[in-house]
C-alpha cells in the first residue's frame, strides 16, 4: 500500500516526506484527534509553520489538512484549503493551544477549490502564504487570501486537477531526488518531467462501451418488523428527568453516611460525593436501558433469535411506556447506598433503602405517576421488588434484565482485569439480544464513558494476568498436563465444564492459575466471544497519559456528577454520534463539504441551456434544433437524471436569468399542468410576463431571481409538475414541460445561491402525504438500514451496512430537484398536516440548503435543498408521532446527511457533450464552407512571378534599402509560402503568414514599384491566410469527429489572429472565436473519482462477496420440505440477486482504465443463482401441485373453514400466476414454443375449485342475509360485505363456462336480497324496540297480576286459619286429618292447591323476568306456552290469551317483509291496548259450602 498518498491525499508520513524533500528537514506536525488538538507550540515557533491533521478519531485514520503559520510577534495565522468559513471552525480550539496573549487570524481564501487536495495545498499555497506573511512589509490578510485563491484557481485551470493528482500518484511511494524547492507547486513542476507522468488528454470515446451500473430493488424484509417507536427517550422525557433530579437532590447528590470509600472527591474544584454510584452512573444505566432495547429491536429486524421471557416476549418487545417505568426505577437503584461497601448484608440493606426511596418518590408524586405512568399501586410494587433485589432474580422480566444489566454494564470501568469482566458481562447480555447487538452496546458504552469523563479501560487478548472467574470471583487452574482442570463430563458432554477454584486455593506442584490470554483462547470462548484475539486501546486515543488524567479529574467530570441536564446532554450527544458514525464508517470518507466541480457533460449542458435561453426560436413543438442538432425529450430527461443541476446552475450567469423573459415571451401560450388531473392548466409564459409587468417592470435581476424562487414555491400547478419530471416519476408530461423543467431547475438553483444570506441550518423538515402501503414500504426500507448500522467493538459490520444502504437507499425521494423544506416542524405538522415527515440532520453542512427569500412573513424558515449527488440521506430513526387531523398515523423519518464518493452515480459520459461537439462541428463547417466559396485555388504562378520580380529588382536602379528589404524580408516569405502551399504544410504557412511585412514596413518605400509589389504580396497573404484557416478548420473537424477536445483546440489555435486574417468576414471570425471559447470551457471539466480509498473499497468488496457467496451456498444446499420453505427460498434468492447486482456495480466502480472488467467472481455467483432458480421453480411447481390437489379434497364444514379454503385458493392462484410470469420472462424473445400446458392443467383444477367456492359462498351469504337481526344488523352486515368482497375476488377468476355464467347470474340476486334487508332495517329496528317495549308491558302486567294474587292468597290463607280455630281443630290435628282424607280422595287440601298455583305463577314470572336472555329468546319461550298458561300467568281473559299466543307465535318466526313487520307492530299495539285495559285478574270465588268439608274453594 502506498505510504505517502492515500487516494489523492497526503498521509501524515507523506506530509513529513514532502517537506523533507523540499528542504525543510524533519518537521513536526499537529493533529486534532477526536476533537482534541495536539500542538507543539515550540516546534511551531521554530519551524514558522505547522501542518495540522484534523478530523481523525478512533475509526478514522485519514482527515483534513490545515496549516498554522507563525507571524511577527504573537501573531499566528490559520490556512484552511477549504476556505475561510471552514477555517473559522478550528479557530477557537487552536487558539487555546497558543501562548498567552497570542492572536490567531484565519486567512480569508475562497472556498470550492480544495478538490480533496488539502495536503497538497498546505505544502504549496500554505508555504507561499507563510513566506508572504513573514516579509519585511507583508501584504494585508485580505490580499493574501485573494492571492491564494487566485493561485489555487490558476493551478486547477487547464486540466490542473488531473495534473496534480497524476503527480501525487506518481510520488505515492517515493519522492524523486533533486534540489530543494520553495513549495509543493515548484516541486511538482520540477519533477513532473523526470517522473514521466502521462496525463491523458481529454478525449471522449465515440461511444461509451464501459459497463453501466444497474439499478437495484429494495430488499427490506416484509416479515420482520417491530412496532414503530413513539419517540420516547431518556433525553427528552420530562417525567424521567424529574425522577433523576429528585434522586439527585435527595440521595445521589448527598454525602455518604458510611465509612467504606465514602470520602468525597474534588474534580476541577468542585466536590463529588459519590463518584462510583452517583448521578453519572445512574444516568448511564438509564441510557443503557434505552440502548439495549434499541439494539434488541435492530437484532429482531435482522431476523436474529433473541432470548425469551416466560410470557414469550423479548427485550425487543419492550414498549415505550414500560421503558419509562424501568428508567424511573433505575433512578433509585443505588439511591439507598450508605457507602461503597458491597458485602451481602450491606447490599441487601442498600437495596431495601433504594426501594423505600423509590416508593417515597412515587407517593410524593402520585398524582402525576398513577395511573399516567404506573397503572396502580401493584404496578409500583412490582418495580419496588425489582429494586429490592431480594431474591437476586435478574432475568424473569424485561425490567429485571434491563435494570440489572444496565447496572452491570457500567461496572466494567472499575473492574480488573477488564478482559475477564467484559467477557462475562458480554456473555450475560448476549443471550438476550445477540452478539452484534451486545457489541454495539459495549461499543457505545465506551463513548458514554468518554462523554461523561469516565475512565475507559483497554482490552488486551494477550494479557498475562490471572483470569478471574467473575461469578463467585474464583479462578481456573492449569493442571500438570498443561490443560485446564475440568469437572467430570455430564451426560452428553465430551469434556466437562471448567472447574472453579476459590481464590484461597493453594496450587499444587506443577499447577498454575489460568491466564487471561489462555482463557480467551479456549474453544468455548472463541466460539461465542468475538473479543478473542482482539485489542482495544484504553484512555482517549490520541491523548497522552497526563492530558487524559487531567480530563478525568476536570470540572466537566464534576458537572456530570452534579448536573442532570449537563450529563444527559453529554450522553445524548454521544448516543446520536453513535448512530451516525457506523454509517460514515461504511463508506469512503469525503473531506470537503463543497459541491463537486462540473464534469464535461455538465459544462456542455450549461452551454446548451444558455443557447436555448438566448435563442428560444430554436424551440419547436417536440424538439429543440441547434446547428442542425435535433434534441428531443429524452435528451432533456437525460440532463435532469444525470447532471447535478445545482452544479449546472453554478455555470450560468445573470444574463441567462435575464433571458427567462425572452424564453417566456416565446412560450407565452405553453400550458403547464399540475400533477393533479383536476387542476386547470396555466399558460406559463403568460403568467411570467404578467408577473414581471406587475412586480418587476424595471427588469431588476435580483427581483427576477426572487420571482423565480417564488415560482418554485407554487405547488398549485408549477412545482408539482417540475418536481415529478425532475425525479422521473411523472406521467403524461409534454415536451415543453420537460424542456422548461430542464431550463428552470438550474436557473432556480442559481437564484437560490445568489439570494440566500442565511446560515444553513443543521436540521430541516420536509412534509409529505403518502399512502399507508407506500409508507409501510418506506418504514421497512428505513428499518433495514437502521438495523444494520451498528457501532463496532471487535467486529466490523460496516460492509453489511454499506450493502443495506445501497439496496434500500431513500435519498432518491429528495434528489434531482430543488426540494422545499422548513426549520419549523409545526409547519409540516399543523399547517400541511403531513402524515410523513422527513427530518434531515445536516451537522456537517453537506446539503447546501438555501433560504427561500422575501416572499412574506414567516418564509424565513423555508429552505430549498438540491441534494448533491455524492450526499445520501441515511435514516437513523423512525418515530410514530401521533395522528394527523384526518386520523392517520404520522411517521417521522430522521435522516443524517452523509457525503462519500460511494454515492456518486457512475453515469456513462458523453450524453451531453457529444451533441454539443456536433453543434460546434456544424458551426465550424458553416464557416469553412463560407471561406471555401470565397477562396479560389492557390495561384502558385503569382508567387513564382513575384519571386522573379524580386530577384530582378536586385539588378535595378531602386534603392539599396528596398533591395535589402525584398531580399531579407519578402523573399523568405515568398519561399515559405510557396513551399507551404505546395506541401500543404500548415506550420510553414503559419510561419510565413506571421512573417509577412507590415504596412508600416512597406510605407518606407514610396514609389510605384513598391506599391505594386505590396498589392501582389497582399493577395498572396490572403491566399496563405485562407489556406491556414481552412486547414485548421479541417483539423478541428477531424478532432471533433473523434471527440478529441484538446486536438480541436490545438487546431483552432493555429488560426491566425484577427489582424493576420483580416480578409475573413467579421461574423465568420466571431463564430470561430465562439467555438474556441465553447471548447475551452470543456477543458475546465473535472473527473471526480468514485474511488478515493482503494484499500477500503477492496476490503469491503471482498467481505461482501464472501458473505453473499456463503448465503448462496446455504440456499443451494438447503432443504425444501414444504411450500413455505420454497417461497422463503424464492424470496431469499430474489434478495441475493439484488446483492449480486450491488457487487457487480461495485466491480464497475472499482474499474479504472481501459482494461476489461473482470466479472469472473460475480459471474460465478450468477451461475449458481441460475441453477438455484431452476431448482426452486421446479420445487415451487411441485409443491403448488400438491397444495391444489389437497385443496380440491377439502370440504369446509363452516364459514371459518370456507374462508380458510378461499384464502388458500387465492394464494394458489397467485402462485400459478407467478410461475406463469416467471416462465414467460425466462423464455424471453426465444423463438422456441413456450410450453405452459402443465400450468394450464393446474389452472383448470383451480377453476373447478373456484366454481365450488363461489357456490358455497353464495349459499353462505344468502343464509347470513336471511338471518340478519336488528340488534346485530351492522355486525352481520359487515361480515356479509366482507364475504361479498371475497366473492368479487373469486368472480374475477371465473372462466366463461356455462357453470361460471350461471353463478355470475346469482350474484346480483344476492345483492338485491341484501338491499331489501337494508331497506327493511329501519322497520326491523322499530319492530325490535316495539318488541322490547311489549315485553316490558307483559312484565308489568305479570307483576301486577302476581301482586294481586299474592294479596288474595294471603287473605284466603288467613281466612282458612280463622275457620280452623272456630271449628276447634288445631293446626296439627287438622293437618293430620286432612292429610289422611286427601290421600284417600275424600277431601281436597285448599292450602296445597294455593301453594301449587303460587309456585307455578312464580316460575312463569321468573322466566318472563329473566335478563340473561334477549328479547327474541324471551318471546320464543313465551310462544311455546299454552294460552291457559298465558292467561293464568298474566291474569288476562281467555280471548286475549288466545290472541296473545297467536301473536307470540308470529313474532317467534323471523321476517323482514315490510308488510308483515307492519302487521305485527299493529298486532302488538292492539293486544297491548287490550291487556292494558284489563287486567281482570282472577279472584278467589267461594263455592257452595259443604258441611263435611268447609275448606273447599274454587277458582
From Swiss-Prot:
Regulation: Ubiquitination catalyzed by SdeA is insensitive to the cysteine alkylation agent maleimide, suggesting that a cysteine conjugation of ubiquitin does not form during the reaction.
Modifications the protein undergoes after translation, according to the UniProt entry: Is able to ubiquitinate itself, but this modification is not required to ubiquitinate Rab33b. Glutamylated at Glu-860 by SidJ; glutamylation inhibits SdeA activity to catalyze the production of ADP-ribosylated ubiquitin.
Domain of life: Bacteria
A Gene Ontology BP annotation from the UniProt entry: proteolysis
Variant or mutagenesis effect after changing residue 277 to A: Defective in substrate ubiquitination
Location of the active site: 64 (for deubiquitinase activity), 80 (for deubiquitinase activity), 118 (nucleophile)
Cross-referenced InterPro entries: SidE_DUB, SidE_mART, SidE_PDE
Effect of loss of the gene: Cells lacking all four members of the SidE family (SdeA, SdeB, SdeC and SidE) show no intracellular growth defect in mouse bone marrow macrophages (BMM), but display attenuated growth inside the protozoan hosts A.castellanii and D.discoideum. This mutant no longer recruits the endoplasmic reticulum (ER) marker GFP-HDEL to its vacuoles, even at 10 hours post infection, and is unable to induce Rab33b ubiquitination during infection.
A Pfam family matched in the record: SidE_PDE
Induction, as annotated: Expression is induced during the transition from exponential to stationary phase.
A GO MF label: nucleotidyltransferase activity
Keywords: Coiled coil, Glycosyltransferase, Hydrolase, Isopeptide bond, Multifunctional enzyme, NAD, Nucleotide-binding, Nucleotidyltransferase, Protease, Secreted, Thiol protease, Transferase, Ubl conjugation, Ubl conjugation pathway, Virulence
Effect seen on changing residue 118 to A: Loss of deubiquitinase and deneddylase activity. No effect on ubiquitination activity. Is still able to restore the intracellular growth defect in D.discoideum exhibited by cells lacking all four members of the SidE family
Coiled coil: 1059-1181
Signal peptide stretch: none
Subcellular location: Secreted; Host cell
Region (Deubiquitinase) residue spans: 1-193
A Gene Ontology cellular-component term: extracellular region
UniProt modified residues of type 5-glutamyl glutamate: 860
EC number: 3.4.22.-, 2.3.2.-, 2.4.2.31
Catalytic activity: L-arginyl-[protein] + NAD(+) = N(omega)-(ADP-D-ribosyl)-L-arginyl-[protein] + nicotinamide + H(+)
Family: Belongs to the SidE family.
UniProt free text on domains: Contains an N-terminal deubiquitinase domain (DUB). The DUB domain does not interfere with the ubiquitin conjugation activity catalyzed by the central domain of SdeA, which causes toxicity.
Biological function: Secreted effector that interferes with the host cell ubiquitin pathway and is required for intracellular bacterial replication. Catalyzes the ubiquitination of several mammalian Rab proteins (Rab33b, Rab1, Rab6a and Rab30) during L.pneumophila infection, without engaging the standard cellular enzyme cascade (E1 and E2). Transfers an ADP-ribose moiety from NAD to the 'Arg-42' residue of ubiquitin in a reaction that releases nicotinamide. The modified ubiquitin is subsequently transferred to serine residues of the substrate protein via a phosphoribose linker that results in the release of AMP.
Subunit structure: Interacts with IcmS.
UniProt name for this protein: Ubiquitinating/deubiquitinating enzyme SdeA
Originating species: Legionella pneumophila subsp. pneumophila (strain Philadelphia 1 / ATCC 33152 / DSM 7513)
Gene coding for it: sdeA
